Structures are given as C-alpha cells and as structure tokens.
C-alpha cells in the first residue's frame, strides 16, 4: 500500500485522476522535411509566375544580420546571422504580400527566441486550439536550463512548473528533458512515479503544432512550431545565452558569403537573384538591401506590417540598378506618428550621394531639409 502524506493529498488526487485517461503512444518524428499545409499564391501572384516562367533562376539568395523578424505580434525570430535561400512554392516570384506562398531555407543560421517569444508562441500558436492540454504557459531561462510553468488540463486544472535541460537530437529536434517537476507546489516526479505515470500518458499532444512527447521528454520541431512564412532547416545545436534560447541551423560554410552593397550597416536583410514581388513592384534578377532608417541595434521587421515600415522610409537606386531600402523599424512606428499617404524621397542635386539613412526622412517636413537636397513626391507602392 502506498502511503501519501496529507500535505500532498490534493496533488496526489489530481495526479491519480490524470491516469484515468491515457492517450495512444506518441512517436518521435524522424527528420521531417514537411513545412505544413502549403497555400497557393494569389491570382495576382499566379499571373506574375506565368510572366516569369521563362526565367531559369527562381531562387533568391538571402542574407540577414541582427534582425528581429516578427512572426506574430508578440514573438520574433532574433536572427543573429542567416544565410539561406527563398523560393515560391509554385515557382516564379517570391511574393512578400503572401507569406503562405514562399519558404525560407536555412543553410546556416543562428536564431534566438527569448522567454516572451516562446511564451507567445506557446499560447497563441502551438497550443491555440480548443481542448489543449496546456494553457496559461510562461517560459523563461535559468542558467543553462529552460523553465516552463502553466496549467495542465485533463479532468481538473493542475498548476505545474517544469525545469528542463535542453539539447538537439540527431533528427534536428529540440529535446526538453525535465530535471525537476512541481505539481501543486510539491515534487511532481515522486507523485508520477508513485502512480506509474509519465507526461506521455498524461498529455495528448496530437493537435499541438510541432510538439511531441516520449516518456517525460518533450520534443519540439524548431521549424514546425513557427507560423508562416514556412521555414526549412536542420537544427545542429542549441544553447541558452542570457534570456534567449539560441538555435544553430546547418553549417557556417554551407553556402558562400553573400556580401551586401552597404557593408557599413550592422543590421540588414539582403536579397539577391530570382524575382521579388512586393506591393506594385516586381524586381527581376533581384538585388535589394533593407536597412533600418534609424539604426539602433537590431532591426525590427514584420511581414504583416512591412508596408507601414516601407511607407515611413524611402529607397534609392544604386549604380548597378539594385535597390537600397531604408525602412522604419517596427519598434519605432508607434513613435513616428501618423504617416501621410503622400511621401517624399530625396537625392542630392549632384546625384553623387543620397539622403542620410540615419535621418528621419519619413517624418521630417521637406522645408526642414538641407537646401542641396532635391525633393520628389512619390506615392506609396501599395
């Protein structure tokens, strides 16, 4: 007979109740190259695809440095470095206006997620479905470990906290191995052993996006846990760095370096080759570098709001007909005020150089600009 002290009676009863319903066994997925359900391009993008069907180069090379790439309003991929390729699912242009229509392949990347990013992903995407077994989740780092707390729901709601070691499997999955579990504030490991339970028997994760369980270990597919745009890549390492969980994909020498026109910018996105489509613009044999209009460390960017960022900035054409785009960082949009629908771009009357990219062109009245600047009115591109 198992003796249970009165102080753990509530926790024991809850854990025992969890054992009444057992889900079918979960299997750890092997290397999975799928990127979820693929949505076809819009009718407009399809027409553009036909128009460029004769082009043999449908892949766009991409390089990023120090970019906070927002995938949902409260979660970003903290891209330290990225070298990869982009392509449309249907061939033809990569269309920025349809993030379901293209994929980013990571040949090499170092990408961080902080506790707030993971928390938002867990609650707003991974477990955002009716009847999810986990809710009200919070995640943070502690030393070299990850701490997750929240509510486990089966028959009753059970508050829990799990402290876990983190590693990468040969298949490229993120493995969370619990080293301490608290249920109702008491030792959850002892309770689960007493009732011959495991997380695999307790949690039905069949509807969760990119998460599986085996025994007491949780496995996260680092690309399937993310909303669009789709990402392909094989995680090769993971570490805790301050408040971030930093993932390494691929190998640093997988592709040759891709050097942007402006090497002085520490934070940028650079696209080269293939065909890019955004707003009303179609760029063949693309060469476009995007930098922060007011640089201050990492560049905050969102596909969902890139038009606002673009309209608040300006662009210039380079001598080789490439495009240099100065966007206002997402974090600065709220402080920029309402942006007029009639915007200004400028170039020096001599044509020798362009506007200072560190100035606030998008919000500064033309009357305040230096006299040696030539002012041209342009309309938004969308």
Sequence positions of predicted segments:
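Hydrophobic alpha-helical targeting segments used for export or membrane insertion
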Residues: 10-18, 37
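Bacterial Sec-dependent signal peptides at the C-terminal "C-region" and cleavage site
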Residues: 15-30, 45
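Extracellular/lumenal and peripheral-membrane lipid-interaction modules
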Residues: 29-382
């Amino acid at each position: 007979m198992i003796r249970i002290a009165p102080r753990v009676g509530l926790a024991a009863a809850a854990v025992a109740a969890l054992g009444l319903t057992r889900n079918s066994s979960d299997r750890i997925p092997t290397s999975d190259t799928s990127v979820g359900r693929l949505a076809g391009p819009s009718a407009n993008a399809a027409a553009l695809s036909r128009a460029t069907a004769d082009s043999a180069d449908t892949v766009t090379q991409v390089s990023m440095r120090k970019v906070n790439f927002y995938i949902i309003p409260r979660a970003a991929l903290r891209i330290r470095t990225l070298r990869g390729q982009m392509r449309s699912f249907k061939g033809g242009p990569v269309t920025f206006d349809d993030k379901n229509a293209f994929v980013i392949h990571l040949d090499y990347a170092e990408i961080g997620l902080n506790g707030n990013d993971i928390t938002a992903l867990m609650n707003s995407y991974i477990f955002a479905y009716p009847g999810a077994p986990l809710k009200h989740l919070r995640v943070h780092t502690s030393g070299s470990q990850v701490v997750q707390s929240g509510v486990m729901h089966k028959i009753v709601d059970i508050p829990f906290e799990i402290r876990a070691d983190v590693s990468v499997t040969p298949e490229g999955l993120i493995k969370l191995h619990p080293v301490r579990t608290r249920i109702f504030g008491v030792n959850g490991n002892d309770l689960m052993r007493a009732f011959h339970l495991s997380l695999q028997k307790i949690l039905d994760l069949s509807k969760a996006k990119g998460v599986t369980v085996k025994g007491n270990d949780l496995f996260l597919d680092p690309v399937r846990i993310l909303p669009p745009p789709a990402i392909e890549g094989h995680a090769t390492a993971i570490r805790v760095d301050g408040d971030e969980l930093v993932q390494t994909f691929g190998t640093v020498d997988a592709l040759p370096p891709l050097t942007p026109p402006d090497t002085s910018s520490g934070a940028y996105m650079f696209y080269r080759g293939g065909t890019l489509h955004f707003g009303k613009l179609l760029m063949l044999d693309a060469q476009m570098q995007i930098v922060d209009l007011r640089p201050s460390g990492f560049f905050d960017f969102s596909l969902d709001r890139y038009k606002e960022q673009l309209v608040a900035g300006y662009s210039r054409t380079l001598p080789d007909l490439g495009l240099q785009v100065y966007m206002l960082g997402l974090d600065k949009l709220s402080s920029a005020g309402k942006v007029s629908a009639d915007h200004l771009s400028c170039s020096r009357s001599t044509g020798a150089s362009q506007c200072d990219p560190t100035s606030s062109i998008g919000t500064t009245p033309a009357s305040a600009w230096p006299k040696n600047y030539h002012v041209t009115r342009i309309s938004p591109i969308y």
